[in-house]
From Swiss-Prot:
CDD domains assigned: CBS_pair_CorC_HlyC_assoc
GO biological process: killing of cells of another organism
Xref: SMART domains: CBS, CorC_HlyC
Domain CBS: 52-111, 114-171
Protein's recorded name: Hemolysin C
InterPro entries, alphabetized: CBS_dom, CBS_dom_sf, FAD-bd_PCMH-like_sf, FAD-bd_PCMH_sub2, Ion_transp-like_CBS, Transptr-assoc_dom
Entry coiled-coil feature ranges: none
GO molecular-function terms, A-Z: flavin adenine dinucleotide binding; toxin activity
Database matches in SUPFAM superfamilies: CBS-domain pair, FAD-binding/transporter-associated domain-like
Keyword flag Nucleus: no
Keyword Repeat: yes
Organism for this UniProt entry: Brachyspira hyodysenteriae
Similarity field: Belongs to the UPF0053 family.
Biological role stated in the UniProt entry: Bacterial hemolysins are exotoxins that attack blood cell membranes and cause cell rupture by mechanisms not clearly defined.
Length: 268
């Protein structure tokens, strides 16, 4: 059975443990194909919260945005789809696709006329159910909302597929490491690094993951506001410095261990 058809079968039906094992143990499958099947089955036990892009890292534009502002947003974000809000970021009214700007005229530009209806999913939905929604509705991006209906982030078809086959990179993706060690003893961290991955580096201070999913999100929740560029934020004997921003979104953070005398002065 072709691997594509096998994945489709798993997504569409509920299987017993025996059937799952049969999928994985099919002798005709290569090791790589068995891994893909295993990863597909595991989508049922993973929630969208684990892979979504949190709201603090999402580039959004207001409904009243001009043609120029929309173009700048796409140039900055390098994504092909951007959420659009009306009365606030919890009021997502549509999604703008970059391809729809091809025939748009700057003179009579109307954002409302070219918006796509957004797909909303609960933060607790499993990745398997999310994948089914994407397939059934022929949509590739969803708005994630919490139990109160507040906007929590976005998740794409690509995010789900990466859970099955690994990272998918395009011409805009950078090859930067999530955590890079510098010769001066400091560390350069991608703000989108997930906290559970960050905490695996035992040489760095562990940070809580109860209020945020990424390192950038942690700084936002820790301060209670958006961090400023070049702002030093002290936490647990370390200095977190925002060295990269794109609009309001933190992109790069430099982390260094504070000297004992500096730590003592701060305590005084």
């Amino acid at each position: 059975m072709p691997i594509k058809k096998l994945i489709s079968k798993i997504v569409k039906k509920k299987d017993s443990d025996t059937e799952k094992n049969n999928y994985i143990n099919l002798s005709a499958l290569t090791e790589a194909e068995r891994e893909i099947i295993t990863n597909t089955i595991e989508l049922k036990s993973k929630s969208v919260r684990e892979i979504m892009v949190p709201r603090v890292d999402v580039v959004m534009i207001p409904m009243e945005s001009s043609y120029d502002k929309v173009i700048k947003a796409f140039n900055r974000d390098r994504n092909s789809r951007i959420p659009v809000y009306k009365d606030g970021i919890d009021d997502i009214v549509g999604v703008l696709y970059v391809k729809d700007l091809i025939d748009a005229e700057e003179k009579n530009f109307s954002l409302k006329k070219i918006l796509h209806k957004p797909l909303f999913v609960p933060i607790s939905i499993s990745l398997m159910e999310l994948l089914k929604n994407f397939r059934e509705k022929q949509i590739h991006i969803a708005m994630v909302v919490d139990e109160y209906g507040g906007f929590s982030g976005i998740v794409s078809m690509e995010d789900v597929l990466e859970q099955i086959i690994g990272d998918i990179r395009d011409e805009y993706d950078e090859e930067d490491e999530e955590i890079k060690s510098n010769d001066d003893g400091t560390y350069l961290v991608d703000a989108r690094t997930r906290i559970d991955d960050f905490n695996k580096y035992e040489i760095l201070p562990p940070i809580p993951d109860d209020e945020a999913d990424t390192v950038g999100g942690f700084l936002f929740s820790y301060l209670g506001r958006l961090p400023k560029r070049n702002e030093d934020i002290e936490y647990n004997g370390y200095s977190f410095t925002v060295v990269g921003k794109s609009g309001n979104i933190v992109t790069k953070i430099r982390i260094e261990k504070l000297k004992k005398d500096n730590t003592a002065k701060n305590k005084d």
